[in-house]
């Protein structure tokens, strides 16, 4: 995403860097909760109580998202103050305000995905957690950024013309938010399938008990 931002302005690059630093607070919170969630899921699957494992994930996700929505509300209400903590350049603050107003409300969805990823890891289904990260960046964020931010036109064989929207740097911010929301929807749907419930239990059941 940094390479895309660099095609606009120095102020946009600086604002993006500051915005990511502010976002790192949400990642820290979500990462810690995700680790705790992984432990809870592993323990409950190990004791053959998958429903309680699911409850751990949903409650942890809801609590994390509530905290991050509250934090985002403060940042959206006072975006200039949040950016001003790091820099006093008017152009950067202006770009940063745009970034925060668009991206900050999606912090909760980033956090929700990280907690659900913790649930998958606790169940021993680590590949799903990796796939969710891939989806967020390469399936949702980057393609949406190419369509929203840039002004290209492409004509397909047969005469069908495709055109990007050309929203500029704001298109990148919307793509960032879209990646969070899209990956969260997929994460929730995948987790609700329940295919993870046999992860730890099956692996333990297949291991022969030691004999004396």
Where are these regions (language model features)?
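Hydrophobic alpha-helical interface/terminus motif in multipass membrane transporters
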Residues: 1, 5, 41, 82-83, ...
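Alpha-helical membrane-embedding segments
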Residues: 1-7, 80-81, 121-133, 204-212
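Short runs within selected transmembrane alpha-helices of multi-pass transporters and secretion channels
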Residues: 31-34, 103-122, 128-137, 144, ...
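Interfacial/gating helices of multi-pass transporter permease domains
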Residues: 4-24, 91-97, 125
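Short alpha-helical transmembrane segments in multi-pass integral membrane proteins
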Residues: 41-106, 152-212
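Structural signal for membrane-spanning alpha-helices in multi-pass inner-membrane proteins
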Residues: 2, 28, 75, 144-145, ...
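Transmembrane alpha-helical segments of integral membrane proteins
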Residues: 114, 140-159
